């Protein structure tokens, strides 16, 4: 709706309204340093200054902001079965774990004919990849922001600003995403009079860098080694028949006649 001009087209996802310090009102230097657990380090610096004309009126001001953050993110290592899974950790043929990707692919040998050739096989899953093996938990974030303010009148300002962001981290959306070397650029020009009006034009550009979907990547990686059809219908079953079935048939009480398949 009309608020898109003010908050942006994705405002329905939620809005955080941030008003940055005006260099005419808040000049000077500010420095920030934080440390914390998980090797967290955050540092930042702001420098702002204003200039007056011959009449002693403030006409031009600028500000520059820099911030950098690094930390080791928590690893997603939940190996419990996903909600609604038909198999548990006790299923020797595997199960679909929360933070293991690619193991969503499931096969079964539960038909009567397959019970004869592959006794005890039941449901079995592709091995997949654990998230910790395919993503980088070393989060990094760099932000730069600059602005030039010009007072056309004492209460009317023309502002140009440029913002840049770069980083690597893990993002939770519909899937798990590894945001790697992602970049954001924003240019904005604005004419405003405090508490009366503003006219704003801006452009935001982004470059996903080397980012990727962790779940899709895991599936593609295991398909490179062996397709789902090749792995489930041939390789795994052949291995089971050659190395597991002989031992199963030697178990005490293993039936040797056909009626057991019913």
What residue ranges belong to the model's regions?
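Outer-membrane beta-barrel translocator/receptor signature
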Residues: 5-87, 139-142
């Amino acid at each position: 709706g009309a608020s898109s001009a003010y908050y942006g087209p994705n405002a329905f996802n939620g809005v955080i309204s941030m008003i940055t310090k005006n260099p005419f009102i808040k000049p000077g230097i500010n420095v920030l340093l934080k440390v914390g657990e998980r090797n967290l380090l955050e540092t930042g610096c702001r420098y702002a200054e204003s200039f007056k004309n011959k009449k002693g009126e403030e006409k031009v001001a600028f500000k520059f902001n820099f911030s950098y953050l690094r930390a080791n993110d928590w690893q997603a290592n939940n190996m419990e079965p996903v909600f609604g899974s038909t198999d548990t950790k006790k299923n020797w043929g595997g199960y679909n774990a929360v933070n293991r990707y690619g193991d969503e692919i499931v096969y079964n040998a539960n038909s009567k004919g397959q019970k004869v050739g592959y006794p005890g096989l039941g449901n079995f899953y592709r091995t997949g990849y654990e998230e910790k093996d395919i993503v980088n938990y070393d989060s990094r974030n760099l932000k730069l922001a600059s602005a030039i303010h010009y007072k056309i009148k004492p209460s009317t300002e023309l502002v140009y600003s440029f913002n840049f962001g770069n980083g690597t981290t893990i993002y939770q959306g519909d899937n798990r995403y590894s945001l790697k070397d992602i970049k954001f650029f924003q240019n904005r020009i604005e004419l405003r009079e405090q508490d009366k009006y503003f006219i704003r034009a801006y452009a935001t550009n982004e470059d996903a860098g080397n980012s990727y979907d962790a779940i899709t990547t895991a599936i593609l990686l295991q398909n490179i080694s062996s397709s789902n059809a090749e792995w489930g219908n041939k390789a795994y079953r052949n291995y089971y028949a050659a190395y597991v079935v002989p031992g199963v048939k030697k178990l005490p009480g293993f039936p040797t006649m056909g009626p057991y398949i019913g």
